[in-house]
Amino acid sequence: RQMCIRDRYIEKVGKGVLGKNCERFENFPILIKLIDAKDNLSVQVHPDNEYAMRVEGEYGKTEMWYVVDCDEGATLLYGFKHEISKDEFARRIADNTLLEVTNAVPVKKGDVFFIKSGTLHAIGKGILIAEIQQNSNTTYRIYDYGRVGKDGKPRELHVDKALDVTKLAPAEQYPETPVEKKDGYDIKLLSKCEYFTTYRVNVETKAELEADENSFNSILVLEGEPVISGSETVSAKKGESIFVSAGTGKYTVEGKCTFVLTKID
């Protein structure tokens, strides 16, 4: 839920609510999702903007994952264990041995993964992920555990395109950043790129934040039931998303909670 249905709201009041830093984007720049994996999801890759525009006529995708919760022993796939050749990549897709060289990472609550375009990745069973991504649906499926679709046929793979765009090396993780202690809350930078900047915010009592003229703020609540007060006051529950317009100025988030804050720098 948001203060207004986002697209209708933007259409009604104008793109100024997105902020000056969003003027370089044709559409609303990000998608924010919660993904609850009840099974191993397909192994996939996203192209960069140049390839996606040339081949698909739309933008590529860079994204970030935040592990909201997970079962004990849960893992996800993130790049390769070591560098491999394009020929080996193609052979392993063909003979179903790809998982022997992919990097299976045990996860815990609070882990962060920066998934730059070209990075092979897959969410494993038993993981709840908050995903912040470029506003694009360009995805190339590489491996799907032999599953079939509703028509009884194996789901489509996009091997040739994946061979074009996949970085055949260990993934480039975003460097670890310190937690900054503030009055009533703490904040930690999770990732920063040309498409989005994300923070994890833990509120003990109250956080005083600001949505200036440069960017909207998006709040995705992971724990607690905060009250957000700015130009108006709304309450939010776990899993809900609140859109704070650029130019709102200072606003507060009150009540013990954890959320992912996203803006455009």
Where are these predicted regions, by residue range?
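Short, small-residue-biased leader/transition segments that mark boundaries at the very start
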Residues: 1-5
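A short glycine-rich, His/Asp/Glu-containing loop-to-beta-strand
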Residues: 8-16, 29-56, 61-64, 176-208
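Ligand-binding loop in jelly-roll beta-barrel domains
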Residues: 27, 35-40, 49, 59, ...
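Glycine- and acidic-residue-biased ligand/ion/polar-headgroup-sensing regions
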Residues: 37-40, 62-91, 203-231
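Long, hydrophobic, well-ordered secondary-structure blocks that form the structural core
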Residues: 44, 50-90, 94-95, 99-107, ...
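Double-stranded beta-helix
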Residues: 78-100, 130-172, 262-265
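Short acidic-glycine-tyrosine-enriched beta hairpin
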Residues: 102-114, 230-248
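C-terminal amphipathic alpha-helical segment
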Residues: 140-216
